[in-house]
From Swiss-Prot:
Lineage: Eukaryota, Fungi, Dikarya, Ascomycota, Saccharomycotina
Region (Disordered) residue spans: 126-160, 289-394, 459-478
Signal peptide limits: none
GO term, biological process aspect, one: nuclear-transcribed mRNA poly(A) tail shortening
Top-level taxon: Eukaryota
Record organism: Candida albicans (strain SC5314 / ATCC MYA-2876)
Keyword Ribonucleoprotein: no
Primary role: Acts as a component of the CCR4-NOT core complex, which in the nucleus seems to be a general transcription factor, and in the cytoplasm the major mRNA deadenylase involved in mRNA turnover. The NOT protein subcomplex negatively regulates the basal and activated transcription of many genes. Preferentially affects TC-type TATA element-dependent transcription. Could directly or indirectly inhibit component(s) of the general transcription machinery.
Ranges annotated as biased composition (Acidic residues): 131-160
One Gene Ontology term, aspect cellular component: P-body
Coiled coil: 173-230
UniProt keyword terms in alphabetical order: Activator, Coiled coil, Cytoplasm, Nucleus, Repressor, Transcription, Transcription regulation
Stated name of the protein: General negative regulator of transcription subunit 3
Cellular compartment(s): Cytoplasm; Nucleus
Length: 752
């Protein structure tokens, strides 16, 4: 009877395992399909959701796996089922399927921990593409290639390698063989323990031994895979530095001598350091090779014009003038001709058209002769194309450049479109070179009027039909950009914030800088650049800007006296030596705040908070708190004073009011362990306003007013939501005695 009950339980578990595997495969297929698409914000959120779903499914499957392991240790499993069938094999098969899913989830977990365009992600992609992504292969199929050659073949193969590389190859091959032998012994020992009958007195000991054996086997396989990768690098001859190789050799010796007891597990970063060092050396070599190639090519061009001797070409003067005119239009940079090592530079800003034309024709003739000679002399030397780093190469980290701004906005107004609307077109002045009769070259800078006249003289003016489409496209782009920008700013009154800044007794530089509301919209990098330039004017009367004497890439040159010291942008550099750690979720709020301020979407954020509040649903409370934290982030950590003022006004609109820390006045009504200004600076703050912003209160329920309780009229009792800056949290205080004398009743009219 008990066997039938056990068999029924196993069948139920089998059914649940199949359902769990189907759900896991379904989520993983969706995850893989999104993984191959572009990494925009929507896809990123979907990938995170699918990763969480996969985590839930794998946890269920792991519970079933533990149950299967328990059943496999039971002898009654061998007698279950009809004759010719064995439940033991079915249990082992299901256990194997679950373990395959666990390995798949490890890949998902590894990918989810890496940022899309981080240096680590790019480097790992590069290493996988060059070394082979065989971290998850448990077979030894490639061992035959590593150990198949004879001693004579190996000597011929390694003849070009340095002695250190050959010694390392032999040592690592021996190490792989020893690791394989130890793994086989551990597998045999594990099978013996698994077949041993379990009793209460030896159950814990056997399980501990099995876990230790499994851990050692995993470490052995890890070292084998990494050593195979390293052997490929050594045999290819790309390893030039052996310091880390010898460190690895010492650790491997200790690990092999102790049969895996030495603490050299898969958590080590020594292999990654070695591979990164190899990649860095390859990158440096490629850059040096390219520089040498460019230098040699330029040296050939210079020698062709040395000592002032030129070979006359068979081309006519008209053909030479035509070729040189094309060169002048396509490349505004001058072609310098050397003679006896002397170069003359002459700046010509004015002159008659006739003189300019005669000189221009002379320039064309001499330039064509020198260019024809250089082309003839260098034709025998095939110039190799300059190689650019691949997307998977670590060199791409150093050569990444910002993308150019699009000609017109696509969809909603972007950073680049808003910036491009205010950039005027600048026409550079081309430089031309005239070769004098005595062999020395004359370097001339031609004025804009002369250049336009020369261009018109050489090529006919474009027709009206050619000019009209370009003009219409430019006007359409400008009108579209301006209309989008105006529609964005229509829903917010910026004048009241400008008025507050004007009333703040700022210096002329600060007033002009912070009164520009566009500074509150641009990306953080542009804000940093503009504020850093303004702070270098060294005005002793600055109220907000700071000229820091030390460079700190993580701090802005700002100090806002109207905010607490612990949230100052330059808090780490010169104002205090204490260590205040910002809460981790601020990164998320920073991203949300940057999106909101980019298109002045503050009212949209307000409407969302209000609509969720009106629903009176308890499930919406975490979402409301998250959105409110975004406004608090803008108030405390917004870069410009305009951002702080905008966030403050919307917090007041939601019913939040700053409340002074009463511990400074002898009362301890807020016992939340907050940090006072006296604790930070050692004395009272000079600005009383900054002490008001450690707490914000929002009334949830009014219990009674002060008059009803025999208290002054400025007192009331109720339930309040409280935002605590020191802990960055919102909690509720019930039956709190609220004193309006410690409360700011309306948004700020001035910064100080």
């Amino acid at each position: 009877m008990s066997n039938r009950k056990l068999q029924k339980e196993i069948d139920i578990i089998f059914k649940k395992i199949q359902e769990g595997l189907q759900d896991f495969d379904y989520h993983y297929e969706r995850y893989e399909s999104i993984q191959n698409t572009e990494d925009d914000s929507d896809n990123q959120r979907e990938k995170e959701k699918l990763a969480n779903d996969l985590k839930k499914e794998i946890k269920k499957l792991q519970k079933f796996r533990e149950q299967i392991k328990h059943w496999l240790q039971n002898d009654t499993v061998h007698t279950l089922g009809p004759v010719g069938t064995s439940y033991e094999s079915k249990l082992a098969e299901n256990k194997s399927l679950i373990e395959d899913s666990m390995e798949t989830y490890k890949l998902v977990e590894k990918q989810s921990k890496l940022k899309t365009f981080s240096n680590q992600s790019i480097m790992m992609t590069f290493m996988d593409s060059t070394n082979g992504d065989d971290d998850d292969d448990d077979d030894d199929s490639d061992d035959d290639e590593l150990f198949s050659g004879s001693d004579e073949d190996e000597e011929d193969e390694y003849s070009d390698l340095p002695e250190d590389a050959v010694n390392a190859i032999h040592f690592f091959k021996d190490s792989i063989l020893q690791l394989r032998e130890q793994t086989h012994k551990l597998d045999h020992e594990y099978e013996k323990l698994a077949a041993k009958k379990l009793r209460k007195n030896n159950l814990a000991t056997i399980e501990a031994k099995k876990e230790k054996i499994q851990s050692t086997i995993g470490n052995n396989k890890f070292h084998q895979k990494k050593l195979k990768k390293l052997l490929r690098q050594l045999t290819s001859g790309v390893v030039t530095e052996f310091n880390l190789i010898w460190l690895l050799k010492d650790d491997l010796n200790k690990y092999l001598e102790s049969n895996g007891d030495y603490e050299f597990t898969r958590e080590t970063e020594l292999y990654d350091d070695i591979f990164n060092q190899i990649a860095a050396v390859e990158e440096d070599y490629s850059e040096i090779h390219e520089d040498n190639h460019d230098h040699s090519h330029s040296h050939l061009e210079k020698t062709s014009t040395a000592n002032g001797t030129h070979h006359e070409s068979a081309t006519t003067t008209a053909t030479a003038a035509k070729n040189s005119s094309v060169t002048t239009r396509t490349s505004p940079s001058p072609i310098l001709t050397k003679a006896n090592g002397h170069i003359k530079e002459l700046s010509v800003e004015s002159g008659s058209p006739t003189t300019s034309r005669s000189k221009l024709s002379k320039i064309h003739t001499n330039t064509s002769q020198s260019s024809t000679h250089s082309n003839t002399s260098s034709s025998t030397h095939a110039q190799a194309p300059r190689q650019s780093p691949e997307l998977t190469s670590p060199a791409i980290v150093k050569t990444l450049r910002p993308a150019t701004a699009p000609s017109k906005p696509v969809g909603t107004l972007k950073w680049s479109a808003a910036a491009a609307a205010a950039i005027p077109d600048v026409q550079e002045k081309p430089e031309l070179v005239e070769t004098e009769s005595n062999g020395s070259s004359v370097h001339k800078t031609v004025s804009k009027d002369q250049y336009e006249e020369k261009i018109n003289y050489q090529s006919p003016a474009p027709t009206q039909q050619q000019q009209q489409p370009q003009t219409s496209v430019e006007s359409k782009t400008l009108s579209t950009t301006q209309s989008l920008a105006s529609s964005i700013t229509d829903n917010i009154n910026l004048d009241k914030y400008k008025e507050v800044i004007k009333n703040s007794n700022l210096t002329k530089t600060e007033l002009g800088l912070f009164s520009d509301m566009n500074l509150a919209r641009v990306p953080p990098g542009i804000q940093d650049l503009v504020i850093s330039f303004a702070s270098k004017r060294n005005n002793d009367n600055f109220k907000v800007l700071v000229d820091s004497t030390e460079f700190n890439q993580f701090a802005l040159p700002l100090h806002k006296p109207y905010l607490p010291e612990i949230v100052q942008p330059s808090y780490y550099s010169q104002y205090t030596s204490t260590s205040f750690k910002h809460p981790t979720p601020l990164v998320k709020f920073q991203s949300y705040w940057n999106q909101v301020r980019a298109n002045f979407g503050f009212q949209k954020l307000m409407d969302e908070i209000k609509s969720l509040t009106l629903q009176n649903n308890a499930d919406n409370l975490p979402i409301i708190a998250e959105l409110t934290f975004v406004l608090f982030y803008g108030f405390y950590y917004g870069v410009t004073p305009a951002e702080n003022l905008i966030a403050e006004s919307y917090l007041f609109e939601l019913g939040w009011k700053p409340y002074k820390n009463q511990s400074e006045d002898g009362s301890n009504n807020l016992s939340t362990g907050s940090i006072s200004l006296s604790d930070i600076n050692g004395s009272k703050s000079k600005s009383n306003r900054s002490s008001n912003y450690y707490f914000w209160f929002k009334r949830v329920k009014l219990i009674s007013r002060g008059e009803d309780m025999g208290q002054p009229s400025n007192i009331e009792f109720g339930d309040y939501q409280v935002f605590d800056l020191s802990f960055w949290e919102i909690f509720v205080k019930y039956g709190f005695k609220f004193d309006y004398n410690f409360c700011q009743m309306e948004p700020s009219k001035t910064l100080f």
